[in-house]
Amino acid sequence: KELKQLYPSYNLIVYDAARPMSVQKKMWNVVKGTSKFKYVSNPNHGGGLHNYGLAVDISILDSLGTPLPMGTKVDHLGFEANITQENELVHTGKISENERQNRILLRTVMKKAGFRPLPSEWWHFNFCSRDEAKRKYKLIP
């Protein structure tokens, strides 16, 4: 709804949302012991909000159904995906100003819808905190 008010021909695309803990364990086994472990929630510590169905990996499609450029692909496990360093990323040529503006648009519409961005992943948004999820919701096995 928020996106349609600003850009009627744009759409959101969901890449990942609810994730069973069984899948989380497989993902963790791929990254544990590597430099990429920090990008995947450890299932031994309760997993993440995807495991409660309370997180979404999302982007924006233009009027032709093409994803807007965001500087990296979804699930890029690296510094360029970070939202807190976007000015530096533009300054050093890692992402363009247009890509930064597209990220800002995504954050704007998702925040208006009640979601919070994850600083290390421009595509990831949480609906609530992990503590709130643990109190109110059940894990997806």
Identify the function of each model-found stretch:
Residues 1-141:
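Cell-envelope/glycan interface and biosynthesis
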